[in-house]
C-alpha cells in the first residue's frame, strides 16, 4: 500500500500497539490491524474489509470451548453491512461451516 502512495499503518499484534500511533492517524489513513481472538471477543465495530485466514484449535488456554474461540474470531464480521467485505479461506472446513452458518451481510470473497 505504501508503495502505491497510500497513507497506511500496520498495527496490532504485529508489534505496533495502536495507541502508540493514534496521533499519526489522519482522516485518509488506512489501517491494517492484526487482532487476536481475545481482542475481538467484545468488539462493537467491524472493519470495511475483514480477513480471516484460519481457525486453529490451539487457543483453548484463554477460551474454554473451541466454538467460543471461533465465534470470537468471527466477531469482526458481526457489524459489517452489504458495502463491506469478508475475505476467508473456504477450503478450511471449520471456517467455511462457521461463515455459512451465520447471516453475515458482507460480500464474501474466498482467498
Show which residues each predicted segment covers.
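Active-site catalytic pocket residues across diverse enzymes, especially alpha/beta-hydrolases
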Residues: 1, 5, 22, 102
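Compositionally biased, intrinsically disordered low-complexity regions
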Residues: 14-17, 52
Amino acid at each position: 500500500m505504501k508503495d502505491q502512495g497510500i497513507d497506511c499503518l500496520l498495527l496490532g499484534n504485529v508489534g505496533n500497539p495502536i495507541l502508540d500511533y493514534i496521533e499519526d492517524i489522519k482522516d485518509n489513513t488506512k489501517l491494517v490491524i492484526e487482532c487476536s481472538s481475545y481482542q475481538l471477543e467484545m468488539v462493537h465495530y467491524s472493519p470495511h474489509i475483514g480477513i480471516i485466514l484460519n481457525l486453529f484449535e490451539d487457543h483453548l488456554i484463554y477460551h474454554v470451548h473451541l466454538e467460543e474461540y471461533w465465534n470470537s474470531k468471527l466477531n469482526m464480521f458481526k457489524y459489517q453491512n452489504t458495502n463491506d467485505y469478508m475475505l476467508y479461506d473456504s477450503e478450511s472446513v471449520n471456517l467455511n461451516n462457521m461463515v455459512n452458518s451465520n447471516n453475515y451481510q458482507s460480500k464474501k470473497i474466498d482467498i
